[in-house]
Amino acid sequence: MNNEGKIMRKILIILSALIFSFSVANAKIILKAGHTANPDEPYHKGMLELKRIVEKETNGEVEIQIFPNGQLGSEKEMIEGLKLGTVDITSPSNGNLTNFVPELGIFDLPFLFRDRPHMYKAMDGAPGKKLSKAMSKKGFRLLGFYEAGVRHIMTTKKPIKSIDDIKGLKIRTMGVPAHVSSFNAFGAKATPMAYAELYGALQQNVVDGAEAANTNYNSKKFYEVAPHWAQIGWTALVADLIMSEKKFKSLPKNVQKALLKGGLASAAVERKAYADSDNSLLSKLKARGVKVTYPDPKGFREASKAVYDEFVKSSSSKSILKAIQGM
């Protein structure tokens, strides 16, 4: 090969390297986000806001693809997917993440929050920040705290008017230790099972009832098989908008910044959507023939004391509980 040919070959190599570098530098980052809710529910609205903010802040460098309705798996499977790299972002209920980050169990206690503003204060204040650090140590980056609704009790055959009415009933719960203990303390037979199996289990009398929020009681049409709806507010569920800490740190700084900004905006949208939905649905449910009762919470609160004794033992959990109750 003559000198002219060698020079041309070097030029082509350099140009190829530059083109490759340019294409890599400008390759779009695709993030897969999954949740188990319907597209018209608050979780999805929150994730749409995350997508909007992040894509805008990064000038299209990042694309967030959202998969609702458990397309990427159950909440537990999606949490595991973060570790495996098959899922980038998800928003499990706090109880399911507690299996990976035990410190989060404090948010699963019954009658912990007085009302929504109190819950948001705990999420966004010192307790939430402390729990965010605990998540980070276990490999999860918190982008924002969602809510999963104020929870009530549905039953298939008889209404719940007092704590005595729940005794002996098989009530579906999530597989969250504090939730299982709560319903056992109420006198029910707590029966953990997958959310996707619940409608059929109610229909076939495998369970006598379940706990849920107004929003998912309505959206999943549980009223068709469990028409008795007791407004007890036994807990207000926290949900965690998270991604893998490893994945988060692998992203460019501007993308990290956009995700954190988007996470806060996303949480604000999701919370408002949940509050608005909860407040507007009760009259619609009554119009559908749902039999709504308002049990006296006193007996439930008294029974809950045993759950606190069981789960609030460490100095750290006692400190966080004291901070929440003092807000």
Residue ranges with predicted function:
Residues 1-2, 25:
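Intrinsic-disorder/low-complexity regions
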Residues 2-11:
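Positively charged n-region of N-terminal signal peptides that target proteins for export
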Residues 12-13, 166:
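Extended hydrophobic/Leu-rich segments
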Residues 14-21:
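Bacterial N-terminal signal peptides
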Residues 28-118, 126-127, 133-327:
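N-terminal secretory/targeting leader peptides
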